[in-house]
């Protein structure tokens, strides 16, 4: 939020759960065109007893950052925020819109992404910065919650 605001962008914090907002920030191009979503999550896998002492340290070793969420997915969210700020500052987004959505709770219930969808947010395309071992993925597994009722005789 502070990084984007420093670049004269207007990030918006949208409350999703108690004290846990999604961050949305949109840059408008100079003319109409497609809307691209840059999406990442701000939570991490919960700590457990088997973690190798890294936790939330943010330790830098041999020029690399080690710590919870460094690759999944704080690095991608930071890169997307920097890209959005650069496009805005240089005026290089000539058409369309680009929105950064940093959503909460991807690792447990996907509350942030669900809130974004239920709010009516729409885009023509999306880049999700999940780590993929440096391979471009054009699809990914997802989840769907269903409630079913069956009636009859067994």
Placement of each model-derived feature along the sequence:
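Fold-level recognition of mixed alpha/beta catalytic cores in primary-metabolism enzymes, strongest
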Residues: 65, 71, 75-154
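Acidic/His- and Gly-rich active-site-bordering loop/insert found
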Residues: 1-68, 89-94, 104
């Amino acid at each position: 939020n502070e990084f984007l605001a420093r670049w004269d962008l207007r990030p918006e914090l949208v409350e999703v759960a108690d004290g846990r907002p999604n961050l949305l920030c949109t840059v408008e191009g100079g003319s109409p065109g497609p809307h691209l979503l840059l999406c990442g999550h701000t939570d991490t896998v919960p700590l457990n007893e088997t973690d190798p002492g890294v936790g939330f340290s943010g330790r830098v070793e041999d020029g690399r950052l080690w710590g919870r969420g460094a690759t999944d997915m704080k690095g991608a969210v930071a890169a997307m925020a920097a890209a959005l700020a650069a496009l805005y500052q240089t005026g290089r987004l000539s058409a369309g819109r680009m929105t950064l959505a940093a959503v909460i709770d991807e690792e447990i219930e996907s509350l942030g992404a669900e809130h974004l969808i239920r709010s009516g947010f729409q885009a023509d395309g999306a880049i999700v910065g999940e780590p993929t071992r440096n391979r471009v993925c054009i699809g990914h597994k997802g989840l769907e919650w269903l409630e079913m009722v069956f009636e009859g005789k067994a």
